[in-house]
Amino acid sequence: MDERSNDPSRRAWLTRAVAGGAALCVHPWALAASEKWPTRAITFIVPFNAGGATDILARLLASRLSDRLGQTIVVENRVGASGILGTDATARAPADGYTFTVSLTTNLLLNQFLYSKLPYDPRRDLVLVSLLARAPVTLVVHPDVPASDAPSLLAYIKANKGKLSYGSWGVGSHGHLACAYMSRTQDADMIHAPYKGEAPMLQDLIGGRIQLAFASALGSKPQIDAGKLKLIGVTGKTRMDILPDGRTLFEQGLTDDAYSVVGWSGMAAPARTPPALVQRMATELAAVAAMPDVRARVADIGFSVVASSPEAFVQAYDQDLPIWENLVKVSGARLD
């Protein structure tokens, strides 16, 4: 038996997800309550600055959902402590179906391994609503790096042990964990240069102060198009709509989970949010995500639309969790 089936936190999540799926069938009153919802404004808490990909996604969904539901949806950027403040605010909010968070893998999954203590337990204090979109990242290098694909890059970093630096948008970020794994498995002893955000990291990569980095497609594509950065590949097992000619690292022979796993943007709510309302929100999100203009805009920011059911989100989370946990261990990343 899979040991994870004995994890109390996971059992609680699965129970809530199954309860959500069954609620509309078992309780007619729940269906009536969900049909009346919402009767006032809804808040989407985004634990990141305005203007980033997650914020753009949240505002796009809020606009379309507001039209469908006939109520205002307020997007609140609650920034601070690597997304902890906004996520904690969601966990502590009334579980009445009027507060949700639109967040990333970092806050909903990774932070529990990066911090010895969090003010919230993501698997106890939140309920997953929908995996909104998958967010692969690009592996880019300075144009002077003599590599044009993944195999030649690995050969280059091996041949230059201890001489190369990679950047990330912060300790414990996807970019940090993936490059640390690459350095460790190739015995490359690359130096990690963490930045406070992706923009300064990309500027130093363009300037040649670091040699390689994983970066969002939203941030890297303009620099790739301008010839200021060279694209080596993208994470995941499918190519990105925004970079259709960019081969996946998996295609190029890097089949490790570290390169196949992708980040995601997801919606969660306070743990005791009524299952019928969780299901109703997921259903509405799926309808919005099917709109061609929404799918096109999401592709423009380097994401691919999913808009899953709560049950499917729990399954995806459970599949990804041991991969990310191992990447944190390999990197040695800690944030407290």
Named regions from a protein language model:
Residues 33-34, 125-129, 251-259:
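Short beta-strand/turn micro-motifs at beta-sheet edges
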Residues 220-289, 322:
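C-terminal lobe and pocket-closing loops
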